Amino acid sequence: MDSRRKVRSENLYKTYWLYWRLLGVEGDYPFRRLVDFTITSFITILFPVHLILGMYKKPQIQVFRSLHFTSECLFCSYKFFCFRWKLKEIKTIEGLLQDLDSRVESEEERNYFNQNPSRVARMLSKSYLVAAISAIITATVAGLFSTGRNLMYLGWFPYDFQATAAIYWISFSYQAIGSSLLILENLANDSYPPITFCVVSGHVRLLIMRLSRIGHDVKLSSSENTRKLIEGIQDHRKLMKIIRLLRSTLHLSQLGQFLSSGINISITLINILFFAENNFAMLYYAVFFAAMLIELFPSCYYGILMTMEFDKLPYAIFSSNWLKMDKRYNRSLIILMQLTLVPVNIKAGGIVGIDMSAFFATVRMAYSFYTLALSFRV
């Protein structure tokens, strides 16, 4: 069989693990621990702190121009630590997905996975990367074209960054590099949930295909059909284990994602309407606004899609030729039927379901923040 036609979920995560290697968290290369310590200390922790301190006693207009990015950096660091804490579980999920890859039986299943979940997951990965690169470029250009010798964002330094040209450019470079690395961290944070939801949805659909075919091949004996059903039960158990691990992995990180998106969408809208000082700044805020929606929408969409695929499992069970099966098969079928009746959903913080209703609720929350801010406008 052509290896390119095989179902290989691990290939969809190569870019994801590349982000962690670039950040010094994963991989085996010289000075990895030094890279990890440097980025964690001076970027993940100190960069948001220097942004927060930089807003102290500054004019309101300057605070608003930097507030969206300060908030995003703060939540980015929070999500980064949440995901880093759960990397062991993420690797376990990937191992279970590889086990499910090996269960693919027919050309129909391979074609479906490669043309649907695999293609969509690659598109999502590329979309996040394009959005990140666009944000880095527009932020840097907007900073370079701002009037006067100003930094990209309000920030505190233990010296006068305007003292000399060299000191200014060192400070500017720190913000440019720091913001770029935090955007790289955000790629690792935000790309994982929708890609995994998409891959899991694909494997649920493949299980549906396998279950619905049982009993329709006259060449197979009753014992062979029963074995296929038991294998389907084992596949379902692995899928439910993945769901349990995803609940643990995304419990806190996605709650931060919802809060971050709601707050930053509203702040960015205000900046676009009232505080953008030139076309480059307007473009940057517009790209940032789009990035906020891109961060949130795929997770919610593929979260509800995954739930809908699980809801189809009972119908797949009764699509098999169960009426002509023996008692052993039907007993196993009843067991699987009871297992598939368990609701499958993942909630951020155990409160907010990761689905489209949560996406629209977040957008409504952002609009509420926006109207509240307008009411304080003089």
Curated annotation (Swiss-Prot):
Keyword Cytoplasm: no
Any GO CC annotation of this UniProt entry: plasma membrane
Side of membrane Extracellular, spans: 55-62, 149-163, 276-285, 377-378
Subcellular location: Cell membrane
Ranges facing Cytoplasmic side: 1-33, 84-127, 185-254, 307-355
Tissue-level expression: Expressed in 1-2 cells on the distal edge of the antenna but not the maxillary palp.
Bilayer-crossing regions: 34-54, 63-83, 128-148, 164-184, 255-275, 286-306, 356-376
Topology within the bilayer: Multi-pass membrane protein
Primary site of residence: membrane
InterPro entries linked: 7tm6_olfct_rcpt (IPR004117)
Swiss-Prot/TrEMBL GO biological process terms: detection of chemical stimulus involved in sensory perception of smell; sensory perception of smell; signal transduction
Record's keyword terms, sorted: Cell membrane, Membrane, Olfaction, Receptor, Sensory transduction, Transducer, Transmembrane, Transmembrane helix
Disulfide topology: none
Protein purpose: Odorant receptor which mediates acceptance or avoidance behavior, depending on its substrates. The odorant receptor repertoire encodes a large collection of odor stimuli that vary widely in identity, intensity, and duration. May form a complex with Orco to form odorant-sensing units, providing sensitive and prolonged odorant signaling and calcium permeability.
Subunit structure: Interacts with Orco. Complexes exist early in the endomembrane system in olfactory sensory neurons (OSNs), coupling these complexes to the conserved ciliary trafficking pathway.
Additional remark text: The atypical heteromeric and topological design of the odorant receptors appears to be an insect-specific solution for odor recognition, making the OR/Orco complex an attractive target for the development of highly selective insect repellents to disrupt olfactory-mediated host-seeking behaviors of insect disease vectors. Odor-evoked OR currents are independent of known G-protein-coupled second messenger pathways.
Family designation: Belongs to the insect chemoreceptor superfamily. Heteromeric odorant receptor channel (TC 1.A.69) family. Or2a subfamily.
Name this polypeptide is given: Odorant receptor 33a
Protein source organism: Drosophila melanogaster (Fruit fly)
Encoding gene per record: Or33a
